[in-house]
């Protein structure tokens, strides 16, 4: 019965905790209790049978109490008949004992304890007159007065010392308060200075940031301009190279024509390096070259005494143009180096 109650409680707890296989767990629990020797049902039966008296009705209990009172009266009457009066019955409630070498009465019943407490609550021993005791009492009184006087003196000295120490402490506290106020003012001034410096630093940082943004934007614009200029120079260089190649081709063609005409006329023409010759790109230079070529053809068709002297030579215009092209290429290289240096600085 008790084991079933425990199993039911365990089943409820497992269900509230959301644990599955409740029946198997409760069965294992009952087997474990039985295996370890915990006979819960046997314990419950022994507890209710031996611990508590048998149940009875109010009538039965009243009858037993009445029988107990009657038996008590019978015993008292029997003792009275045998000569046990009040004094005998009172003294029979005490025993004689020994405590620290002194004889004492030991109560055996509750009534005896009450009687002993009532007898000793107001008990006072009578004083035994003696001159020695009176002398000791007088000396004791004198010593008590001296002790009180010393205590008063000690108290007065301590009070004076405490008052002096309190005054010194008060002065020190006032001095500390003044120093504290001074330090507080210094802290306030320092805070104001710090706030002012923070504002100045913030303004400087903003100005530096703005300047840096402007400088960076200016650098970017310069870089874009330099890139455009480099691209323009590169394109111009390509155009110049194409023009030079075209002029060299025309010069070779003209040389072949001149050689052919010279061969027909039976003349000798000196070889000229065509790779180092060029002409001006302007209209005036083209016109002059055309006139020079016509005059050269006329001279070749009508040779004179100096026909074996080579004509042409180094063209001053070509030399000036080549020098100008070299200067432009040098400036282009310098611009490229400056641009690379600015890019490195920005990075």
Swiss-Prot record:
InterPro entries, alphabetized: Rotavirus_NSP3 (IPR002873)
Source organism (scientific name): Rotavirus B (isolate RVB/Human/China/ADRV/1982)
Keyword flag 4Fe-4S: no
Similarity comment text for this entry: Belongs to the rotavirus NSP3 family.
GO biological process: regulation of translation
CC per GO annotation: host cell cytoplasm
Segments of skewed composition (Basic and acidic residues): 306-317
Places the protein is found: Host cytoplasm
GO molecular function: RNA binding
Bias (Acidic residues) ranges: 274-286, 294-305
Source domain of life: Viruses
Protein name per Swiss-Prot or TrEMBL: Non-structural protein 3
Coiled-coil regions listed in the entry: 230-257
Function: May play a role in stimulating the translation of viral mRNAs.
Chain positions covered by the region annotation Disordered: 274-321
Keywords, in A-Z order: Coiled coil, Host cytoplasm, RNA-binding, Translation regulation
Location, primary (coarse class): host cell
């Amino acid at each position: 019965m008790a084991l079933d109650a425990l199993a039911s409680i365990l089943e409820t707890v497992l269900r509230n905790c959301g644990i599955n296989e409740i029946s198997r767990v409760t069965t294992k629990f009952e087997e474990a209790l039985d295996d370890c020797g915990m006979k819960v049902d046997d314990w419950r039966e022994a507890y209710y049978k031996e611990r508590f008296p048998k149940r009875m009705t109010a009538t039965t209990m009243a009858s037993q109490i009445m029988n107990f009172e009657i038996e008590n009266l019978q015993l008292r009457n029997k003792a009275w008949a045998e000569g046990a009066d009040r004094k005998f019955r009172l003294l029979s409630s005490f025993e004689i004992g020994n405590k620290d070498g002194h004889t004492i009465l030991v109560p055996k019943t509750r009534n005896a304890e009450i009687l002993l407490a009532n007898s000793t609550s107001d008990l006072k021993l009578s004083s035994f007159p003696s001159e020695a005791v009176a002398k000791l009492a007088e000396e004791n009184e004198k010593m008590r007065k001296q002790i009180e006087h010393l205590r008063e003196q000690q108290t007065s000295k301590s009070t004076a010392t405490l008052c002096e120490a309190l005054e010194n402490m008060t002065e020190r506290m006032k001095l500390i308060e003044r120093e504290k106020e001074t330090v507080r003012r210094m802290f306030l001034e320092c805070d104001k200075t710090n706030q002012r410096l923070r504002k100045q630093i913030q303004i400087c940082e903003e100005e530096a940031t703005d300047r840096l943004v402007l400088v960076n934007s200016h650098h970017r614009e310069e870089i874009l301009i330099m890139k455009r200029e480099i691209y323009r120079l590169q394109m111009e260089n390509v155009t110049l190279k194409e023009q030079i190649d075209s002029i060299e081709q025309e010069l070779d063609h003209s040389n072949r024509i001149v050689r052919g005409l010279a061969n027909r006329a039976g003349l000798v023409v000196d070889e000229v390096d065509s790779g180092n010759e060029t002409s001006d790109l302007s209209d005036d230079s083209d016109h002059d070259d055309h006139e020079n070529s016509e005059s050269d053809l006329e001279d070749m068709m009508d040779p004179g005494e100096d026909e074996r002297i080579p004509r042409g030579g180094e063209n001053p215009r070509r030399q000036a143009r080549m020098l100008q092209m070299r200067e432009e290429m040098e400036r282009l290289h310098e611009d490229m180096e400056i641009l690379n240096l600015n890019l490195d600085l920005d990075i």
